[in-house]
Amino acid sequence: MMTAPNVVQSSPSLALSFLSDLTPPSLERTWLTAPHPTLPLVATCSSDKTVRVYSLVNFRLLSTISGGHKRSIRTCAWKPNVSGESVLATGSFDATVGIWRRWDDYGEEETLAQGNKNTKNFGAEEDREEDEDDEWRFAVLLDGHDSEVKSVSWSASGMLLATCSRDKSIWIWEDLEDGDNNFETVAVMQEHEGDVKCVAWHPAEECLASGSYDDTIRIWREDIDDWGQVACIKGHTGTVWGIDWEDAENVPFPSTSNGVSGQEEEWKTWHALSGPRLVSCSHDQSVRVWRRQPKAQLNTAGASSIPSIIRPSGTDETWEEDVVLPHAHELPIYAVAWSRRTGLLASVGADGRLVVYEERFVSSHTKPQAMNTDEVSPNLGEGVCAPHPSTEWSIVAVVNGAHGIYEINHVAWAKRADRGRDGNKEEEVLITTADDGSIKVWTLTR
């Protein structure tokens, strides 16, 4: 049986430092900041019915997108795997989803992402024309939800867009990429019993997760042309405000003790079987990590062998709670972000606190032990052990009152692109978004 991670409440060991505000900010509540997948850009959505696009090179406003929605813009997401232009989806309290396009004329995409000499032009908003806003084209309006749109998310391929709403539904749209900005409705799922707060696509597969006011997380997959629920994850005792997936290649930090070996390979083996984990945050003030049980496999040791575990066939999945992270918030937690580069987790919420967590291997590696059929992992035969290395989670950095007295609505990781970065390594920044309209950028150092 897989060894559950330990939870360690420790003194912060990393330093979170304020780097810059994104300026000028909105004068109204700002909900979310979405980093561009390749360029040093972020998009922020606001109650003033606009999306502001900022440079991460000099933290200045590049353009303001407006005119497409009649009420607050609650959410936005960049389409991945697009060449030559940027495509942004926006979700609004007016119950619609907008698709915006803009040709990438800041310079060569690759050189901009690397932050070399061309980045100077990218960050120099003073060189821009007054009609910058007109360069964003309102391509299409997706209409279908009956109430406020709360979250939008593109699949890893960029072909599918998921949207969710206060109307308790999740819609999946396919971008036909026919040159006419046509989208087709692929599925409408209505199993949630409350306002659906968030959706997030698996980092590699066409698998969708959602969180809701009904306190559950649900997993969705397509089976023979029909989308349906394959898991309903229960454990939170309050609204699930945010979810995020672990990177498919994530490996915990090494143990601080010497003499620990083999854990990384064992981890990768288990990771390949169960796939990326899912993290969630809730009104119940907890951050929880969930892991999918691997599908049952047949024991093929001999011709007469039979499965050691009899499980129903079909698409249903079993998800288990991997760990509850150390308690760090005193009020509802609104957002959580799992770094694709380092595996660090960050959370923010109504208490104005920014918290960073780290997972490490521990030296007290549980030795493999034979187990009975009631305890065996579903992917293993009778008496076979599950040598999963032990890990522990700890709080490594905390900032209280990160935006003064204001609630923090969102947190995101992004690649650092300003001139103060270390050019010899790939650094990250944290971006927090708050009720007062401010967006702050933070660095994390050991």
From Swiss-Prot:
Spans of repeat WD: 22-64, 68-110, 144-183, 191-230, 235-300, 328-367, 402-446
Primary role: Essential component of the cytosolic iron-sulfur (Fe/S) protein assembly machinery. Required for the maturation of extramitochondrial Fe/S proteins.
Name of a matching Pfam family: WD40
The protein, known as: Probable cytosolic iron-sulfur protein assembly protein 1
Biological process terms in GO annotation: iron-sulfur cluster assembly
GO cellular component, one term: cytosolic [4Fe-4S] assembly targeting complex
InterPro entries from the UniProt entry: CIAO1/Cia1, G-protein_beta_WD-40_rep, WD40/YVTN_repeat-like_dom_sf, WD40_repeat_dom_sf, WD40_rpt
Keyword Cytoplasm: no
Record bears the keyword Cytoplasm: no
Alphabetical UniProt keywords: Repeat, WD repeat
Signal peptide: none
PANTHER family hit by this protein: CYTOSOLIC IRON-SULFUR PROTEIN ASSEMBLY PROTEIN CIAO1-RELATED, WD40 PROTEIN CIAO1
Family designation: Belongs to the WD repeat CIA1 family.
